[in-house]
Amino acid sequence: MDIQKDNRMYMQIALLTSKRSYARRLKVGCVIVKNHSIISFGWNGMPTGYDNCCEMEVDGRLVTRPEVQHAELNAIAKLAENGYSSKGAAIFITHSPCIHCALLIQKCGITDVYYHTLYRSSEGVEFLTRAGVNVTHLDVEPPFPMQPCDCRIEGCDCGGTGSVH
């Protein structure tokens, strides 16, 4: 079994999963793996019963609505709903976790975190590292063409760098 090859495949699946998000600013996907099997996946989006609009305009800027549920939360909640445990699992995320998701990841017993792109804040990675969780940047070729930002989205976080969303 080629663990590195499998890890690259899981990250590509997380990247594909991110395409399910309706977010315009940042699409995030994740996959939870335990004993070499995918046990859950998730993407960022609105709670059940809400419309699929993840952003709102505030003072002429497009900002993420506070109700948006992060990919990590959705994947972990799906496990809990079905009576499964994430203890000892690995999570593959398109973007490194925010501090709130990092706290959830650590509390749920996930031992390995792999991320493709560093989120705008490194607080989550720093917390997980201090907490003894293995954190690894895993750069893989996306299984589909990524679209560079053309900065037409009001309030885009790329700051004109043309980063990929």
Regions found by a protein language model. Name each.
Residues M1-H165:
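Zinc-dependent deaminase catalytic domain
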